[in-house]
Amino acid sequence: MLVLLAGIFVVHIATVIMLFVSTIANVWLVSNTVDASVGLWKNCTNISCSDSLSYASEDALKTVQAFMILSIIFCVIALLVFVFQLFTMEKGNRFFLSGATTLVCWLCILVGVSIYTSHYANRDGTQYHHGYSYILGWICFCFSFIIGVLYLVLRKK
C-alpha cells in the first residue's frame, strides 16, 4: 500500500510539473513551413517571441488560458490536500477530498484542451501540427483522471 501511495504521489507531482510546462510553453501549434510556434501566451519564431497573437482577442483563447490556470491551481490544491489527509486522516477512510479536487482539475483540463482543439488545432488546409505543450495537456488529462479515481477508491491503511 505504501508503494502504491508513493507511486500516486510521484505521478501527481509529475502531472503538476507537466501542467506548468504545458501552460507556460509556447509550443501548442508548430508551423511545418517556417520555424515558428504558437502557444497560449506568445507567438515565437526562430528569432524572437512576441506577445501579439493574431487570435488573442478571441474569447476561446481566453477561456483556454483560464481553464489551464484553474487546472494547475486545482492540481496543486489536490496534492496539498492529499499530503494533509495522509498525515491526519484516520485509518480506513478514503481520500474523497483529494479525489474530488483532482477530478475538478481533470474537468478543467478537459474543457481547456477541448476548446483549443475545436477552435485552433483542427483547421483544414493549415501548415501546422500539434506541439509538445498540446500533447502534454492531453497526457495530464489522462493522468489526472487516473489519479482522481485512485484517490476515490483507495483507503488509508
UniProtKB/Swiss-Prot annotation:
Gene Ontology cellular component annotations, sorted alphabetically: membrane; plasma membrane
GO BP field: apoptotic process; bleb assembly; epidermis development
Keyword Phosphoprotein: no
Topology in membrane: Multi-pass membrane protein
Protein biosynthesis listed as a keyword: no
Main location: membrane
Subcellular location: Membrane
Ranges that cross the membrane: 1-21, 67-87, 95-115, 134-154
Pfam short name (any one): PMP22_Claudin
Domain of life: Eukaryota
Residues annotated as glycosylated: 43, 46
Key words of the record: Glycoprotein, Membrane, Transmembrane, Transmembrane helix
Family: Belongs to the PMP-22/EMP/MP20 family.
Name of the featured protein: Epithelial membrane protein 1
Organism: Homo sapiens (Human)
Recorded name of the encoding gene: EMP1
